[in-house]
Amino acid sequence: MKSRLIIITITIFCALMSFGQGEKSFLRTKDEISMKVRKYFAPSLDLPFVNEFYAKDLTVFINDLKIEGKENYLKRLQMIHDDFFKDIKMENLHVHTNYFSPEALTGDGKTMGEVNSEKQTIWSNAWGTFTGIGRVSGKKVSFRMHMDFRTKNGKVIEMLAYYDPAQMNAEIEAFKKVRLK
């Protein structure tokens, strides 16, 4: 009886240990990458920081709009701050960073290790409410936004942004009309 109990205990222990050996993905909120993403959303545009934040070969998707390269995205970002909006804030900001193991499944059933050559795939997720005042229209804008940042070697190499662009597009159109006069 005693040997049977020992065998059962060892079997359960081994099963639990092997269960824990699979995927090792984890999530953080106070890590260095999450804190950099938080800093990115500071009310004033810190160009030296943003320049270091993004990799040169950055790819950005804003809804279905694709922007290739850090230089091109930084031009757009600077226009948002300098030409389109003032008093920009990201209210109710939440940021967390996902550290995916190579065994983590992707949307098509492959593993992260099969899709990416990196040892670990890192995505930070951020969401909150973008607020600001249109520089041309004077209208207060407020819309929810979700953004994802893929980091490699300490720099963001891919960014995804999802939001309803109606208010931003209205301010861009107002800016274009004034500029054409």
Model-derived segments and spans:
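C-terminal and inter-domain tail/linker signature
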Residues: Q21-K181
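Bacterial Sec-dependent N-terminal signal peptides
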Residues: M1-F26
